[in-house]
């Protein structure tokens, strides 16, 4: 089949998010063709170029979210009036005037997919109606780039904030807040003006797969709206949660309005998608609170390449039995301060213990945090010397992967007997899975998907509790047999659940499920414009009854294509073109 892979700030760019996952997915499903539609986030990302493409990537189309383009569209009076109406309706939903898109609970904004059989309210459809109204206007007029940056858009947003029924944060929005929100909406809605939704674009694929929520899912929603192509949404991090975590210092009005936008877009994507996959149960709970129907949800764990860690995982224990290892990006969310205080307690009971902190800082904030941690380590653990003529040493070391002692990540995990994770905020703990693949016993804080990943193969303590963290580390340092048992169990669990192979197989099954239940009805034409005989198998015209769902799942209706909906004529697809 032919898949339209939708990304934002990710594949195929070298520095993209989830680049490795997308590349492994495309290469692992070599029997399918992929058309990649990528939204870039920065000029730097574009300048770094693309990762080498798999042979089954048919073509790549890109668009920018960081640079304001000019589509040259000039709206007439009637078009401007339509734009003001639809954008004003979208702004009213975000401001909560006369109802708002739910971002909690279980109701979907889609009329087709209401939770627990409940009928969707008219207010719940307002976000989608306004969004598709803008999309149809953009398609007719050739784009909305100028309109979304116009004074009319800001004034429509201001009217919505001042309207009766608007929530408190919206009513308190000032001019800088309105300008910031309008600028963000203009960037996020740029996919409305793209020419990706014709019969030679996303209209020619069998399935759209959005590799994340947010703007990446928007082209999939529009392809479904205009051409009926089914949509699959995959999220390893929920955009609404990311917004809350990354914008703590934004003005309340900006935080509130953008949270409403992310929640509304997420609810619309979940409602219209055939299947929604989450990377873990933690993300799945967020999806449910944003309106996802439980019957559509699947949990597909990220796939990791186990081969680089095989030698360490299968070798006889050769690590320093007194060493604790922490590996990851250095940033405040990792709470290395608590780890250092916990290690001070460990040293009181195990004087030979050492702590290796392996990782590079994440941005300027991470660099400042790393400097603070170095200063704290020097204060807590003054350099110790065995005698008056010996050089002193610190039991805490700060290192990075790639040096002579730790050329690759597997060497870092192999250097310690216990791997520690001390985060206060965590999504899917990649470093923890790598430690499990290396057969290492782990001590982790109970955040994000840690408990789900660890199962019963490691010790879990509350976050921000240095004493509990220290006690767990001491318990494992003193019991090598227990470390060995936990490490073996951890490696077995990781190989069973978190490998590339299981990830690829899961998505292959989901692709087949979606295309079999929601195929795109097309009339294929030959060079003369006549219907091409036998272009579609006879089975596509036969209504069938699907097997009963598994026990405990609600029964689903028959396939949508059996109802005899209108068919859409398309021109034949040309020979595969080179990726550009």
PLM regions and their residue ranges:
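Short acidic alpha-helix that forms the nucleotide-activated donor recognition element
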Residues: 268-271, 390-416, 437, 467-471
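Conserved donor-binding/catalytic core segment of Leloir-type glycosyltransferases
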Residues: 311-347, 354-361
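Nucleotide-activated donor-binding/catalytic signature segment of Leloir-type glycosyltransferases, i.e.
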Residues: 370-404
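Aromatic "clamp/platform" in nucleotide-sugar-dependent glycosyltransferases that forms part
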Residues: 424
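Short hydrophobic beta-strand element within catalytic cores of glycosyltransferases
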Residues: 441-444
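Short acidic/histidine- and often glycine-rich active-site loop of Leloir-type glycosyltransferases
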Residues: 447-460
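Conserved acidic donor-binding segment of nucleotide-sugar-dependent glycosyltransferases
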Residues: 459-466, 475-481
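A short, well-ordered alpha-helix in the C-terminal region of glycosyltransferases
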Residues: 468, 482-497, 503-513, 523-527
